[in-house]
A protein has these predicted regions:
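Metal-dependent amide/peptide-bond hydrolase catalytic core
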Residues: 19-24, 31, 205-214, 218-221, ...
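Acidic/histidine-rich catalytic neighborhood of metal-dependent amide-processing enzymes
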Residues: 133, 139-217
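Residue-level recognition of well-ordered beta-strand positions that form the cores
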Residues: 92, 106-108, 171, 229-233, ...
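Acidic/His- and Gly-rich active-site-bordering loop/insert found
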Residues: 20-136, 155-164, 335
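Fold-independent oxyanion-binding glycine-rich loops
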Residues: 83, 107-109, 202-204, 232, ...
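Alpha-helix boundary/capping motif
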Residues: 3-6, 406
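Short pre-catalytic strand/loop immediately N-terminal to key active-site residues, enriched for Gly-Thr
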Residues: 129-140, 393-396, 437-438
Length: 460
């Protein structure tokens, strides 16, 4: 059962009418939830699956839910529609000291698809069970969207102001590189971010355990992104014939080479600093322990950090043929490449050398790598804020093996950090939740995150 009210959507081409829906459960009585969990649950119930390649359910309904919540706080949000149904929300919050540089606080509203057959709950049901909120987007990243709304709401309802101007962004299309979301806004509406010099968003601020000591990872860098298509050509023919120029075989060989490639370890400034801090906590000499071994001591966070040590070339999709007994003349594969900032050209050259000249390479999408200093007033404020809420817990920098909308904002000179604070138990495999089956987030972690975020936005 849904309720609907009419709102307008402002895009580059003007305003269009659309109905916004607020999903409600028709099942058994649900547990009492605090505001952050309730908002996150509501957002999960909007299926904003982004399939890539221009295929998406769209973010419009979720965007209009957010727009209504922001208007209830007395703000004047704008909705920007890059293509039909692909909607981002931007709102500016005046700070107590508007002369200070502004801070962009942003999340994305789209999610990757989920196959209900693989889940133990409805991935878009917003189910609360075992002290956790389950559903696609519970971690990536409707949790942060909810924490943003709650933190800003708490500040404004108390009659206060954030310390500086905030630009709140709830963006479309992050899961497909942000072309229709952050990159669209940066290109077509850069004035939205006037005065802002820094940003915070996802995949940082969460806790892990190192030698039994809870520590927080602040994301201060991102690997570069290169999405390529491999295309092998051959001779079409009957499946019973001897066909040496088999496109599928040629493609399979290239895919296997890239998928098995062990790229060398490359330590960026961010990763060097991280390993030094890990070694200090473990009380070992960083020069006497291999980087791989140190990373394995970072608790569940090793799932992210291992990927930050070296380039990865992961095949993700295959397409070939149309009938069992027909050898096709073309076969294609998609490969997701993530490399260190500044190494894009060298890595592509090595990929070409690895697969040879018989397979074509088409670059589908690229985005830059980033490294931001683990120093300065914002880093100091984040560290101090976490210490107020979890005294004595170290804060460590790390390079994200994936990417965020901070890449687009960097084109405007905005320095981005990953800070969506969550205090997690030691057995919570947080990296496995991203794009995983049975994605979920602890309710108490959501409450912690909204408190920390409110504190930071009030004081920085």
């Amino acid at each position: 059962v849904t309720t609907a009210t009419s709102v307008g959507v402002s895009g580059a081409a003007g305003s269009v009418g659309r109905m916004t829906t607020t999903p409600t459960s028709t099942g058994p009585t649900e547990p009492e939830l605090d505001e952050t969990a309730r908002i996150a649950r509501d957002l999960i119930r909007f299926d904003t699956s982004n399939y890539g390649g221009g295929r998406s359910n769209g973010e419009a309904d979720a965007a209009e839910y957010v727009e209504a919540a922001l208007r209830d706080l007395g703000l004047e949000p704008q909705l920007f529609e890059s293509e039909p149904g692909r909607v981002s929300v931007i709102a500016r919050v005046e700070g107590a000291e508007p002369a200070k540089p502004g801070l962009v606080v942003h999340g994305h509203l789209d999610v990757v698809p989920a196959d209900p057959a693989n889940w133990s709950v409805d991935p878009f049901g917003g189910v609360v069970r075992d002290g956790m909120l389950w559903g696609r987007g519970a971690v990536d990243m409707k949790n942060m969207d909810a924490m943003m709304l709650t933190a800003v709401g708490d500040i404004l309802r108390a009659g206060e102001r954030p310390a500086r101007d905030l630009v709140l962004g709830f963006l479309a299309d992050e899961e497909a590189g942000g072309v229709l979301g952050s990159h669209f806004l940066v290109k077509e509406h850069p004035g939205l971010f006037d005065g802002a010099t820094e940003a915070i968003s996802e995949v940082g601020g969460y806790s892990t355990f190192i030698d039994g000591r809870r520590s927080y990872l602040l994301q201060t860098g991102e690997k570069a992104l290169i999405w390529i298509k491999l295309r092998a050509r051959g001779t079409a023919g009957h499946g019973s014939q001897m066909i040496e120029a088999n496109a599928v075989t040629r493609l399979a060989e290239a895919v296997a080479v890239l998928g098995r490639q062990q790229w060398p370890i490359v330590l960026t400034d961010t990763t060097t600093a991280l390993l030094g801090e890990v070694a200090r906590i473990l009380d070992v000499d960083v020069h006497e322990v291999a980087p791989d071994e140190l990373v394995l001591r970072t608790g569940t966070a090793k799932g992210f950090i291992r990927g930050s040590l070296r380039t990865t070339t992961n095949p993700t999709m295959l397409t070939a043929g149309y009938k069992h007994n027909v050898v096709p003349d073309t076969a294609e594969a998609l490969v997701d490449i993530r490399c260190m900032p500044g190494q894009e050209a060298a890595v592509l050259a090595e990929v070409r050398a690895l697969i040879g000249d018989d397979v074509e390479i088409e670059t589908m999408h690229t985005d830059i790598g980033l490294e931001t200093p683990f120093s300065g007033p914002l880093v100091d404020a984040i560290t101090a804020t976490l210490d107020r809420h979890d005294p004595g817990a170290p804060v460590l920098p790390y390079l994200l093996s994936g990417g965020t909308d901070n890449k687009a904002l960097s084109l405007l000179g905005i320095a981005g950090y990953g800070f969506a604070p969550l205090r997690l138990d030691e057995d919570m495999d947080f990296p496995a939740m991203f794009h995983g089956v049975d994605e979920r987030v602890p309710l108490d972690a959501l409450s912690f995150g909204s408190r920390v975020l409110r504190d930071l936005l009030s004081t920085y």
